[in-house]
Amino acid sequence: MTSRLLPMLCTALVLVCFSTAEAKNFRWSSQGDAATMDPQSQNETFNNMINGMVYEYLVDRDKEMKLAPRLAESWTNPEPTKWVFKLRRGVKWHDGSVFTADDVVFSFNRARESAVTFKLYSTQAGVARKIDDFTVEFTTDQPNPVMLDTLANIYVMNKAWCEKNNVVKPLNYTKKEETFATRNAMGTGPYKLVTWEQGVKILHTKNPDWWGIKAGLYEGNIETVDYRPIQNAATRMAALRSGQIDFVLDPAVQDVISMRNDKSLKIWEGPEIRLIYLGFDQARNELLYSDVKGKNPFKDRRVRLAAYQAIDVEALKTTVMRGLSRPTGIALPSASGAGVPASMDVRHPYSVTKAKQLLNEAGYPNGFGFTLTCPNDRYLNDEKLCVAIAGMWAKIGLRVKVERMTKANFFPRVQGRDATAFLAGWGGGSTDAIFFLKPIIHSKDSKGAGESNYGDAKFEALDVLIDKLEGEMNPALRQKMINDAVKMIHDEVHTIPLHTQVIPWASRNNISLVHRPNNVLGLIWVKVN
């Protein structure tokens, strides 16, 4: 009897072990933490990625970055300014209630109250109107050639949940407001938020009722997702190498070469849709945090051009970025994706001599001092970039104090227009130029444009051109407008483009995933093998 029971017992043990192995825990890290669980209050890629585990868009991007149906199943564009979306039936919120058109209309109206660029996106999407429980009509002010891209920016929230918890308006992250939605979330997405201990961990668990499982969208095997913010790069990488975590979103660039030779690890890398750039306060009559009194040097194009021409981007690529950057003269996250010809990718030439001459002509022969505000946990080597640039500016007499801070403090500062000069980045899923030109280059207006134009630069001709571009449906005319805008930004030195990032990810060698140029980790495709 014992001999017969033994094989049965072994089989049972194998089955138990197999079942346990299927319930995978995925542990990952990066240098920063989430900003808020309110999905309409802070438009920052990492924060959107965390919120995207819980909340969903009407349309979203697939593995190849193509737009695909999500909460909207299909759509038509019967008139130039009308779009009709058929919503997916059978979708349930995490509390078991049914997703309907009321939630969509509510969410787009709510986003219009946002203090950041979600206001712009909801305005571009037009007015949402419920036709029936599973049909929504959007009416826009003008034709929108990138309507679907626009919708892939607004997460849909549960109307009843927001009303019950008194969060019918997005919190103002810039003012550091706290509401129930700051630390709580309830969506339709593939994961449920279990807990967020700020600065310690974010824990999610798989939503077994997610509609995407039956639809075949869930290809991973993760039951729980355990995120741990680790600001120190060496500590982060030590945790990965020792197996304490499975994945690092932002390995230190200086470690990438050695990691490529480590057989216990995998390196995933490719170009990111993101521009790293410098901006200046061009609005105030007297510059903040500067030894110049009674005027603002950065209102003078010659000063901005001097700052531009004093920067050696090739040196930054070699010494700071270790090759993980692509210097550019085009102020767009993806020039090729926006259709801008390569012939336009020309920088104002690096020349310390010319930069000094420009400062002298502008009335600053001895230069001047000011503060450069930088994040130290947001972009690849962001703090080191600022320190290196400050050193380059010192050669022409610009005396720079580098003000370093976490992104939790950086974004409220710059969004509140409390910076003299700053280093920032902009990117995302869409490569269309309007998604950079409208929030970053256009001046601020009541419809949400210019919300991320942190220096409040204003050039009337650029504003007019961008406004026309926004509704232009003729591809050839639209491309000409994009090219013209790029040239005007370059000529006026609206901002100083530095480079687009090449993003490395690092994982244990038993992890499979999809590396995408929006720098968003799709957890539904991650497998722990």
What function would you assign to each model-found segment?
Residues R4-L6, T76, L120-P170, T195-E197:
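Surface-exposed binding/hinge segments that line
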Residues S29-E79, N109, M186-P190:
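N-terminal lobe/hinge region of extracytoplasmic solute-binding protein
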Residues Q42, P271-Y289, G294, N409-E470, ...:
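Acidic-aromatic pocket-rim loops
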Residues K66, I154-G220, T224-D226, V352-T353, ...:
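Gly/Pro-rich hinge or "lid" segments in bacterial periplasmic/extracellular proteins
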Residues V84, R301-L305, Q309, K317-T318, ...:
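Extracytoplasmic/peripheral linker and loop segments enriched in polar/acidic and small residues
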Residues T179, D209-S258, R301, G391, ...:
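Ligand-site clamp/hinge motif
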Residues Y191-K192, Q309, R326-E361, R378-E383:
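Structural transition elements
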Residues W505-N529:
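Long beta-strand-rich cores associated with HINT superfamily self-processing modules
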